[in-house]
Regions:
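Acidic/His-enriched low-complexity segments
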Residues: 1-248, 349-353, 375-381, 392-397, ...
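Charged, low-complexity, helix-prone segments enriched in Lys/Glu/Asp/Gln
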Residues: 14-27, 144-145, 223, 327, ...
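Short, glycine- and charge-enriched coil/turn segments that flank and shape catalytic ligand pockets
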Residues: 50-52, 87, 165-172, 203, ...
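Charge-dense, low-complexity polyampholytic segments
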Residues: 61, 338-339, 705-710
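Non-catalytic accessory/interaction domains
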Residues: 67-68, 148-151, 213, 297, ...
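Extended hydrophobic/aromatic-rich secondary-structure runs
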Residues: 97-100, 112-120, 125-127, 142, ...
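Hydrophobic alpha-helical and helix-loop surface patches within well-folded domains
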Residues: 177, 209-464, 591-592, 607-608, ...
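Hydrophobic pocket-lining residues within nucleotide cofactor-binding pockets
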Residues: 182, 274-275, 692
Length: 810
């Protein structure tokens, strides 16, 4: 029998029966320098509301021994240990072994190729703690955790509560951490290794940042900014939620081979890819700020107050995604962060919400496996945008009042969505029951356009819209620019809403100006060409972003060509003044040229993008971003200029080599020489990325083996290598690998949720396929794990839209 996924009914029954008093977890890491094993002893003290009843504890690790109140237990073969004959108060002791920390979920051993040092991280969301030690792996059974960790003497061990007692034991040291506050199992963590550490004080908090030793110089470079952002975020959330972060110590640990970041209470784990080896661009620094504040928001929304079950996963993640942008705009230098959100995640969410995996933001979750499949664009950027609209709908002051009441009422407990709705409703005068049903329990996206009825402008919805507040901006030409003549907020609840207060005539009316709601828009028929032509002249980053969002949505819906969208985007880029959107817009238009344009149009559109990059490169503040864009789009002539401009910039040289390899240049010797002098411990991945782009059967075979079969590429680098592997114009070489992708589907979920999402989406072929292949892939995935199925269905729908766009003449 395979490892079973916990169902909601099982969780509710167990929660009604069991109250966990505490976890005492003893972990032995001393075998890791020379092998893959972790040994754990988990002691769980809990009470039972019905003495004599039976339940189970989760343990998908190898069970060496298990006793309940001194009586030996027999583990099942489904990742569970039956617990019969429960007493009123119980002590469960389970000794377990995780025999493989290289590919199994829950805990991961990484070896730094620079110096051979070993690092260990754990990451448990949604239910992967059970692969390491025995626990009640569900969010509502919160309890204090006391971790004791034995590790090699040269290592530092980090966990949630900080300030451990450390005992010397010869070649090892034993770290005993104080009790955590009541936490869900998935919010606990152990990170270990010979870290480079930096500490600062800020606002009464003891802040630490950690990375592997080979990245010490990079960590030192970025530490000031990380500490500044951390202090700003802690102060903002303390005021916004009327509750300071209750623990003095707040650590952030940058780990190798980690995907994304994880909000463990008081000890956030990051991928060390966020420590950029090259000087970070503005967009990369802004992303660092957004992720830092996202994970920090979880300290309150997720850790202090926790969802009762995974049907409120959306709220956990959407709230953190909303709050990080709210805090970044209000407390940091990244004041255009909502424009960046629109240019990136929100555009992805619009596309996802119109595809085969569109779902209500809040939906019943049968089991944890289903929960793992909705860490998606609807949960994150759409959810964040909906919460932004909720704050607009009720007013920010009342929103803050409601949030403060929510945290005061439910601290260290668990809640449902209704608890939050009740707190916000009590703080204001809005009926949120209708809002909740329309926004959270109904799938899909509203669409608005404008009609003119004499002198009256009518905002027209496609169907009955959700209750919302949005704005319509009126713009007039002033020379070569557009200036806003009026901005009218409109409260919408009916299919047709008159908009009063607009000028009698305007050169452009922009629906959803200021981007206050989550809705797609269409210009009126007479204004379509105007919007495409003058989007670049709009006066703010957010207004230009709203126009770009409309153009993008029309492209993905088959209502605009890639050439039209590309011309609009290149014009916007040439005029753009906000660093928050230049890089995401450049990525978007490059993707349009590569992935959406017909073969006949691709060279001209790619050349146009390269021309904008050369123009932007004349601005010293944007030179780095522009040259990176040039590295994706340059012809042989452009590459020569890129080489001249790159000088000793190792990052740009790697990027140029990828493009030169794709174009058929012999870069083998130069790649080897650059690998030799690149100080980045992960430079071998850059060399493999160059190799992946080479239009040669041997290069493709080697890359596929390392990327998809052996999985030696760190998960955070899979996307970059895969993008170099799947290149336009190489269909004959790539066609066999499209078939191999289908053969890989049954094992795409190996390694846990994050690898499953990454491998499924990034390896899906965008070239060397047709619409029949997309249908075959969608059929082949029907029996796969939910996270693989949903990820593949979403990605394949996007590729289907790309194929349609490529078949359309400009």
């Amino acid at each position: 029998m395979g490892i079973r996924s916990l169902t909601r009914i099982e969780a509710e029954r167990r929660s009604a029966l069991v109250t966990v008093e505490r976890y005492d977890v003893d972990i032995d890491l001393t075998a890791l320098p020379n092998g893959p094993e972790i040994r754990c002893v988990s002691t769980v003290t809990f009470t039972c509301s019905e003495p004599g009843a039976e339940t189970f504890v989760d343990c998908a690790a190898e069970v060496r021994s298990a006793t309940l109140n001194g009586t030996a237990l027999t583990p099942g073969d489904d990742g569970r240990i039956p617990l019969p004959g429960l007493a009123a108060r119980n002590v469960l002791r389970v000794e377990s072994l995780q025999a493989d920390t290289t590919t199994s979920p829950g805990a991961h051993k990484a070896v730094d190729p620079a110096d051979g040092e070993v690092y260990l991280w754990t990451s448990f969301e949604p239910d992967e703690a059970r692969f390491v030690w025995a626990c009640f792996d569900q969010p509502d059974l919160k309890a204090p955790h006391a971790f004791t960790v034995t590790a090699p003497a040269a290592w530092t061990v980090l966990s949630n509560s900080g300030d451990p007692r450390v005992e010397e034991q010869g070649a090892a040291r034993r770290w005993s951490f104080p009790d955590t506050p009541p936490l869900s199992v998935y919010n606990t963590v152990v990170n270990a290794g010979p870290f480079h550490e930096i500490r600062r004080e800020a606002g009464g908090h003891d802040l630490g940042v950690f990375a592997r030793r080979s990245l010490a110089e990079v960590l030192e470079r970025d530490a000031d900014e990380i500490f500044t952002l951390t202090g700003q975020g802690l102060a903002f959330f303390a005021e916004a939620f009327a509750m300071p972060f209750p623990q003095r110590k707040y650590d952030q640990v940058f780990m190798p081979e980690f995907g994304g970041a994880m909000e463990n209470y008081g000890c956030v784990t990051w991928s060390d890819m966020f420590l950029r080896r090259a000087t970070p661009t503005h967009a990369e620094r802004e992303l660092l700020a957004v992720v830092l504040l996202h994970e920090m928001a979880h300290m309150w929304f997720g850790n202090i107050v926790t969802m009762r079950w995974w049907d409120d996963l959306w709220l956990n993640e959407a709230f953190a995604e909303f709050a990080c942008h709210w805090a970044a705009e209000g407390a940091t230098r990244y004041t255009d962060v909502w424009a960046g959100h629109l240019a990136g995640g929100k555009l992805r969410a619009y596309l996802s919400d119109q595809g085969p995996v569109s779902h209500p933001i809040h939906q019943p979750i049968h089991d944890v496996a289903q929960a793992a499949s909705i860490f998606d664009s609807i949960t994150y950027p759409k959810g964040a945008s909906v919460l932004q609209q909720l704050m607009t709908y009720v007013g920010e002051d009342r929103f803050r009042t409601g949030m403060a009441a929510y945290f005061a009422r439910h601290a260290w407990g668990t809640t449902t969505l209704q608890d939050l709705i009740d707190a916000l409703a009590e703080a204001g005068d809005r009926d949120l029951a209708t809002w909740r049903k329309a926004w959270l329990e109904t799938a899909g996206t509203d669409r608005f356009t404008l009609e003119h009825d004499g002198s009256t402008v009518i905002l027209v919805a496609d169907g009955t819209p959700r209750p919302q507040v949005l704005a319509v901006g009126a713009y007039d030409r002033t020379g070569d620019a557009l200036e806003r003549a009026a901005l009218v907020r409109v409260e919408v609840s009916e299919p047709r809403t008159p908009v009063t207060g607009l000028p009698a005539t305007s050169d452009l009316l922009l629906i959803n100006d200021d981007d206050l709601t989550f809705a797609t828009t269409r210009p009126d028929p007479a204004g379509r060409d105007t919007l495409f032509r003058v989007a670049a002249r709009l006066p703010t980053a957010i207004s230009r972003g709203v126009a770009v969002a409309t153009v993008w949505d029309m492209l993905t819906a088959g209502e605009a060509t890639a050439a039209e969208a590309g011309r609009c985007l290149t014009a916007v880029l040439a005029a753009e003044t906000s660093d928050a959107v230049i890089e995401p817009f450049l990525t978007l238009v490059t993707n349009i040229a590569e992935l959406w344009a017909p073969d006949a149009d691709r060279p001209a559109l790619t050349e146009a993008v390269a021309g904008v990059c050369l123009q932007l490169a004349d601005d010293p503040g944007r030179r780095q971003v522009a040259l990176r864009g040039l590295a994706r789009t340059a012809t042989a002539e452009g590459l020569a200029r890129l080489r001249d401009q790159a000088d000793d910039d190792v990052d740009l040289r790697w990027r140029a080599l990828v493009r030169e390899a794709e174009l058929g240049g012999d870069v083998t010797a130069e790649s080897a020489a650059l690998l030799e002098r690149d100080p980045d411990p992960d430079a071998w991945v850059r060399a493999l990325t160059v190799r992946a782009a080479v239009p040669d059967p041997a290069a493709k075979a080697e890359t596929w083996q390392r990327l998809a079969v052996d999985r030696t590429v760190p998960v955070q680098s899979v996307g970059a290598v895969a993008a170099a592997f799947w290149r336009p114009g190489q269909d004959a070489l790539l066609a066999p690998y499209a078939e191999r992708y289908l053969a890989e589907i049954p094992r795409l979920d190996q390694g846990g949720m994050i690898p499953a999402m990454v491998y499924t989406s990034q390896l899906f072929p965008p070239y060397a396929i047709d619409s029949a292949y997309v249908e075959r892939a969608q059929q082949a995935v029907q029996e796969a794990a939910p996270v693989v199925r949903n990820t593949l269905l979403e990605r394949s729908d996007t590729v289907r839209r790309m194929l349609r766009a490529r078949a359309v003449n400009a």
